[in-house]
């Protein structure tokens, strides 16, 4: 995102938001605080929010009217099943975005027999200047709370059986709805999908989605890149579990370089599509968790993406990992939010497999070595060739280097690793020439860089393995040459037989 083009486009997006305010103050204090005691006792007879229920084969929602019990029966509401309700966000146009119907379809196809699928449609309130839509979030939250309170009173439906899924501004709407419920009757779960950042970042707990708004709150952050104090999505933790796919700042396949492709297809709408790509990725990650229940993306507790990229955070001990999306394990082990990181693919299915590599190099030279390596894997179910390895610094001494490698397919249990020094041929020729001049001693040419073993930890299975050089009499690495490492454990022969 350091590209000047990226900065310019993002600034343009921010200017659109700011200009829509017509001079209004851009700060959370300008929207007032929640008045829970004053507002929760008000039960509106009519709402500006439409509550739709989706049952059967039809895609057209059936509207439930507050205080009209007959509509519950007409729409097929089943009080013995949980309610999963979608809450959309700010709208540039006065129609619902396509992702809403995609999520409805995914929920119906995967969970139709076990949940009520609903939608809180607040188009007339969301299709406004951004700051006006922000002001309306409290009203919509109150109306959702009124619906849930009415369901509790009329058909004894407990709010603890409710799961609100809010995208962008809808995440904060869901939070407000939860705050208007009494402590004894809290909403069961709220999922925030890239909760809107402008006017909410760094706001108090009462002015945004927070862990207090439901028995369990999870959030997925996908577009938190910040410039001039603004970001489309919120960066700060706002839930019991906060997931940061690819670090949360941007998403694969959503680079601003894609803008040129979008311009050719969508014209000026390309800017909106490019920005929305990362913001809306949170939605598609959630939908993916429904459609590919057998390929759940695992995330890991970590301090930041830099440490995660070094492979230092692939532990599942004491609740340090969790699945992303609908099937997230609902735990509240402490009041402190847990930030979890993971890598994803650029398209569905988004799941990748995380591997921590620890390699101890022995540098026999006095000068730092900055080689480029590739690694190839052979597993019981497949193989992957020439995956590049990036070291954070040059190899200066006898030091252990840790880094993360991800695969987009399951190759099964690792059997063999091929490690290659991918220096260009010119460098290889120079290196060999130097070695013919410098007397390293008898035997084969020496590179001054040795590698004895590779330690691997698989995030998804928590399995640990050690790989040793196939030829323990030759541990030296050479430019443009490949070295094979095999499992050191006693069961390595059994593993080899699995692929025959």
UniProtKB/Swiss-Prot annotation:
Residues 1-21 form the signal peptide. It catalyses: a triacylglycerol + H2O = a diacylglycerol + a fatty acid + H(+); a 1-acyl-sn-glycero-3-phosphocholine + H2O = sn-glycerol 3-phosphocholine + a fatty acid + H(+); a 1,2-diacyl-sn-glycero-3-phosphocholine + H2O = a 2-acyl-sn-glycero-3-phosphocholine + a fatty acid + H(+); 1,2,3-tri-(9Z-octadecenoyl)-glycerol + H2O = di-(9Z)-octadecenoylglycerol + (9Z)-octadecenoate + H(+). Its EC number is 3.1.1.3, 3.1.1.5, 3.1.1.32. The keyword Zinc-finger does not apply. GO terms for molecular function: apolipoprotein binding; heparin binding; lipoprotein lipase activity; lysophospholipase activity; phospholipase A1 activity; triacylglycerol lipase activity. SMART domains: LH2 (SM00308). Keywords: Glycoprotein, HDL, Heparin-binding, Hydrolase, Lipid degradation, Lipid metabolism, Secreted, Signal. The keyword Ribonucleoprotein does not apply. InterPro entries: AB_hydrolase_fold, Lipase, Lipase_hep, Lipase_LIPH, Lipase_N, PLAT/LH2_dom, PLAT/LH2_dom_sf, TAG_lipase. The active site is at 168 (nucleophile), 194 (charge relay system), 279 (charge relay system). GO terms for cellular component: extracellular space; high-density lipoprotein particle. PROSITE patterns: LIPASE_SER, PLAT. Residues 353-487 form the PLAT domain. GO terms for biological process: cholesterol homeostasis; cholesterol metabolic process; cholesterol transport; fatty acid biosynthetic process; high-density lipoprotein particle remodeling; low-density lipoprotein particle remodeling; triglyceride catabolic process; triglyceride homeostasis. CDD domains: Pancreat_lipase_like, PLAT_LPL. PANTHER family: HEPATIC TRIACYLGLYCEROL LIPASE, LIPASE. Belongs to the AB hydrolase superfamily. Lipase family. Catalyzes the hydrolysis of triglycerides and phospholipids present in circulating plasma lipoproteins, including chylomicrons, intermediate density lipoproteins (IDL), low density lipoproteins (LDL) of large size and high density lipoproteins (HDL), releasing free fatty acids (FFA) and smaller lipoprotein particles. Also exhibits lysophospholipase activity. Can hydrolyze both neutral lipid and phospholipid substrates but shows a greater binding affinity for neutral lipid substrates than phospholipid substrates. Homodimer. This is Hepatic triacylglycerol lipase. The gene is LIPC.
